[in-house]
């Protein structure tokens, strides 16, 4: 269980709350999070790297010279992997890098990652109504008022991402905005500071709660 203070748009205390999520045992937490992160990064790979073997390279069907009598090393094809322009031995072929992790494990890892970031958590009130139009300067100033440094990697968790908020934040290089129901372990543990609205935390408990 994590107790937190809710801040308003001006950065002043506006309330308190608690976040209750079931986490992994300390002795297995690190291994579990590692597995889920590996799975997440593997799933992001395109896996379409492809090279040609000697049988796929154009040409090379004719024997370059006769087997015996020339004094040269025997050769059967100009596309041998030993030759320039030849095929590739054990080169990459299109493949699926998926590492299967059970959904229960993913959710447990995510809850554990969130609780592990408790010291870096900032909870704020919903602020979508503050952006009648995109304004990067306003969002940057708000992040500073809430206690986040511009040099920190910031993960901003919202229930919904209004267009004006998205447009205001997309040019802030260290900021990533994500929906509460689309969280992943990698983004959570990569962040130096996790900022979430109180409504987003309620959504997290609803979606990922044990």
Swiss-Prot record:
Annotated region (Disordered), positions in chain: 44-77
NCBIfam families recorded: rplD_bact
HAMAP family: Ribosomal_uL4_B
Family per similarity comment: Belongs to the universal ribosomal protein uL4 family.
Biological-process GO terms, alphabetical: translation
Name of the protein in its database record: Large ribosomal subunit protein uL4
Organism: Microcystis aeruginosa (strain NIES-843 / IAM M-2473)
Compositional bias (Basic residues): 60-71
């Amino acid at each position: 269980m994590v107790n937190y203070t809710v801040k308003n748009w001006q950065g002043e205390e506006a309330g308190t709350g608690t976040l209750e999520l079931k986490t992994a045992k300390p002795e297995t937490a690190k291994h579990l999070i590692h597995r889920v992160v590996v799975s997440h990064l593997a799933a992001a790979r395109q896996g379409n790297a492809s090279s040609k073997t000697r049988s796929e390279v154009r040409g090379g069907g004719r024997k370059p010279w006769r087997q015996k009598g020339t004094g040269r090393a025997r050769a059967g094809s100009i596309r041998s992997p030993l030759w320039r322009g030849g095929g590739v031995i054990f080169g990459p072929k299109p493949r699926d890098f998926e590492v299967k992790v059970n959904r229960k494990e993913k959710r447990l890892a995510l809850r554990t990652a969130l609780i592990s970031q408790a010291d870096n958590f900032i909870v704020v009130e919903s602020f979508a109504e503050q952006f009648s139009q995109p304004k990067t300067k306003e969002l940057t100033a708000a992040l500073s008022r809430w206690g986040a440094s511009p040099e920190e990697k910031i993960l901003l968790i919202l229930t919904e991402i209004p267009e004006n908020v998205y447009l205001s934040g997309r040019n802030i290089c260290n900021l990533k905005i994500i929906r509460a129901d689309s969280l992943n372990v990698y983004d959570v543990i990569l962040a130096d500071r996790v900022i979430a609205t109180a409504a987003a935390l309620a959504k997290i408990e609803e979606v990922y709660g044990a």
